[in-house]
Design a protein with these regions (language model features):
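HIT superfamily nucleotide-processing domains
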Residues: 1-128
Length: 128
């Protein structure tokens, strides 16, 4: 099922998808993801070896979204305090800096729906 931006707008930082079945990858993309699914320690080193507190990357294995929407991941250093990466104003500020004047939807999956749970991260969807 291809998810439209309008569908994605049902979710936000206060209301992430309750189930991983509400938004998912294509079967092919999911299989590629499972083959790649990184060692979380290696991923941490890859993302944060430069000492940054956060980084934004285009999703390597995006959800099944329409072509006019891009899927990014906002990764936070796992060494940050819980309070900071859960500060909604801080998250909004980061999103506004990087995607100024763009139509965005963003959320962090519930813990039970995270496949990478040792590195705090938000899904960001940007409509072109």
């Amino acid at each position: 099922m291809v998810y439209t931006f309008e569908y994605l707008q049902h979710f936000n930082i206060n209301k992430p998808p309750k189930s991983s079945k509400l938004i998912s990858r294509t079967k092919d993309m999911h299989e590629k993801y499972l083959k790649y699914k990184p060692n979380q320690l290696n991923l941490m080193l890859e993302l944060f070896s430069n000492g940054n507190l956060y980084t934004i990357k285009l999703a390597l294995f995006p959800y099944d979204i329409e072509n006019n929407v891009q899927h990014y991941i906002l990764w936070f250093s796992p060494f940050l305090k819980y309070k900071l990466y859960n500060d909604k104003n801080y998250i909004k500020k980061i999103i506004n800096i990087h995607f100024k004047n763009k139509n965005t939807v963003y959320f962090m999956n519930y813990h039970k729906n995270r496949s990478i749970n040792k590195i705090p991260h938000y899904h960001i969807f940007v409509k072109n």
